Structures are given as structure tokens and as C-alpha cells.
Amino acid sequence: MGKHLHDHPDVVQVLDAPELKDLFGLSLSGMAQTLRGIVEWRKHRTGMLTTNFAEAGGFIKSDPSEPAPDLQLHFVIGKLVDHGRKTVFGHGYSAHVCLLQPKSRGAVTLTSRDPMALPLVDPNFLADPDDMARMVRGFKRTREILMQPALAKFGAKELAASASARTDAEIEQFIRQYADTIYHPVGTCRMGPGPLDVVDAELRVHGLAGLRVVDASIMPRIVSGNTNAPTVMIAEKAVDLLRAAP
């Protein structure tokens, strides 16, 4: 239990686009626009605040020889730095690339006998060289997309942190510094019949009576996409299992 932790490692390129004031941004005009948006949403449930912020995305191959897409892209209508924890003024947009089937595995371990103590979470991102190689290719593919005429016409400029990464070695250094979770952790209570597996096919913990695990941690391997819908499915299946239990 607690082993086999994995997630979709994600890295973002943030672009400054001062002229795109219809996007979310910290500025006088942006604040006024947001206030108008709040009023519109409260009155009509329409307008800019109905956005999910990640308004576009897609699945691509890091290399044409891949049998299936191994990268997922998210396009955000604002300058999102450090999950929004860092204040960035002005208007712009962000492009995320995340690895769908990472080989690296981390772990969650206890730090004490106190059940209220926070555990130690080691995501161990990019420990496998193949993960980094795919992320570097994905970073470069994302930059190519951002340079296409449909976006280039807005004159956006990458923020310095990523703009200075030009060679593969520099891109790798940028990724190691800035790659982070996209909130899709799975695997620490994985399903299976083996000695290192935690639950069986009915979500029951091996060796313990009356205990089941019902969340994304039971996934033996992460899905190639967002984990929300599969986790809902796991919960719905658990309901059926509990109703059928004697």
C-alpha cells in the first residue's frame, strides 16, 4: 500500500499577449471586465465567468511512430503560473503539455503513528529517462503549435522562464524545474491478485474483512486522459457491489 504512485506530469508555457484584453488578466481593464462578468453571470448565468478556463485541448503523439497519443494538451485563457499561486499581471494565455503514460513511480508513506500527521508524498516525477524524453518532445511540439499563424498573429511572447529554453538540454532543465502535478494521482492501492496489490476485483482490501477502497488509487495504471470520469465509474461500480453484497 502506498507504492506505485503515478500521475500525469505537466509543464506549461505561459505567453504574454497584452492586446488580448478579452482574456482573463490582472489589469485595470481586466478587473472591470471581471466585475461586469460577475454581474452578467448573476443575472443571466452567461458571459465570461461560465468558462472552464481550459477551453481547448487535444491528444497528440510525441513522435509519429507512436501507436497512440502519449501527450495531452490544455490551452488556458490566462497566464497561469504555479497553479495560479503566483501573481502575474497583464493578459495572455498558457499551454500545458502532460505525459499520459509515465513509467516513473513514486510512493506515499507514513511519517508517524499519528493518524492526523501528514504523509510523505514522493511523486518521483521524470525518474525514468523515457518520461523526460517524451516531455521534451512534447514541449517542442507545443511551441510549434503556439507559433502557427492562427496564434502568431496576436504577437504573444513566451515568459522568460521558458523562452530561454531552446536546446534539448535547456528544455530538460526547464521541465525539471517547473514540471508539476495536474492532479491525477493513481495507483497507491492498485487492483490485482499479486503480493504487492491492495484490492481485489470487488475493491476489497486483501487480508482485511469489511474494507474496500473506492477511489482513483485502485487503478493499476493511469488512464490516458483525465481521471475524473473513470473515478466516477469506479464509485458507481462500488455502489452496485455493495448493494449486491450479502
Outline where the language-model segments fall.
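C-terminal structured subdomain/cap of oxidoreductase catalytic cores
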Residues: 1-20, 63, 93-151, 172-246
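Short, glycine/acidic-rich hinge or "gate" loops at secondary-structure transitions
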Residues: 152-163
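Mid-to-C-terminal "cap/lid" subdomains and adjacent gly/pro-rich loops that border
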Residues: 1-89, 144-149, 169, 173-177, ...
